Amino acid sequence: MADPLIIKICGIKSLDMLETTIAAGADMVGFMHFPRSPRHVSIEDIATLISTARGRIETCVVLVNPDNSCVAEVAALGPDWIQLHGPESAHRVEAIRAEAGVEIMKALPIGSAEDVSHVAAFADIADRILLDAKPPKGADRPGGLGETFDWALLEGLDPATPFMLS
């Protein structure tokens, strides 16, 4: 049996957006906690959003190369997931997973077959892998920024590796 399709809507910033996402039937919502993102949400607002969402939809807080104090602050809010969307090493992802006590999603930038080969290093460390397009040259923040990558590159991925596409 194939893994179920999971719909995650990221960039939620308000209670209205949260309610619309829940009503639309999404499985998970993401809140960006990265000041350079136009979708950045403060810790205080994330706390309110998580509290409102609890028991209705899974929540995920997106962090970029967080320090330990940021991880602890976010973990204390009780999200279902923390998504790491920066250049975190496998060792750092493992440490954050142990520290946070919540499920960890690791986003990996894909732009070449070599990028796909790095997925295996995170497969047993992160609870879920999210494959995203490599940021365009000159981008000042991570993520595909609305771009896609050549999905034919996924043919080089071990079929036993579960993943999500961004």
Put a short name on every predicted segment.
Residues 1-166:
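Conserved N-terminal beta1-alpha1 strand-loop-helix module at the mouth
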